[in-house]
């Protein structure tokens, strides 16, 4: 990525903040007055399972590119760079700067965007997060909060369980309360983003079969709305569970949202319709993303728009239609021209 972007004459920052963890930030034009930011993440998830084609082969078959990260989101990153290349190759004057942000560790702990926040100030009029949306215009996504919930007991020999306190039994009661709370959360709705949700994802407890467990831990995630964060959900959970469990924040990724009639949505709809010939679909991104680093952290109106289907992300036989990638390039070119290229005189 660095080599490609430097080859376009862009001012490139290569930030290897950890071994094999790299952010690439590239600028064309005035970096203090940016018209549009185009974002992608460079990392992918693991490749367990039996694949039709080798997962890192990038096999082209049936008009699709197959492989891990093809949809999430190597195709989006490639389309961003191809679009910037096309715009700069045209030689038109820029009225505002263009910024490309490619980060590491989105799939894990968001270290790349956290590093970006620490090291880089960005002021811009618009941002496109090139996550896989099937070229639909996504105005935002719910936030992602997660927690460790821990119960404590007293270990003893399992032949006399009443001599101790079984932390797994305590956790079983906690989980029943969480199931009821999760049902309650589905009644909390946002017109654009749907309902809140809560799910128990993992459980660990006990060290030996013949020992009453003194400790049990689960991991819980909740999807939340703009203006909410992990501390608020933590407080609700702790009040619900009282002394039965300890609630510790694991992660906190804020929601991102722009109005459906905002300028960036209207502009994206026009560009998608122009390129594809179809009426653009406007909806929400069903998963989580790092869009809030730009919309909330930098105050930039931000949408999600990219090739590929999020429904195939993280799955065996992930793939993306080549036509969607080609259309994405043209859509990004159109967006860049509207936000950053000077009009012909």
Put a short name on every predicted segment.
Residues 19-22, 109, 134, 287-290:
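Short acidic loop-to-helix transition motifs that present clustered carboxylates
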Residues 73-146, 190, 344:
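Acidic/histidine-rich catalytic neighborhood of metal-dependent amide-processing enzymes
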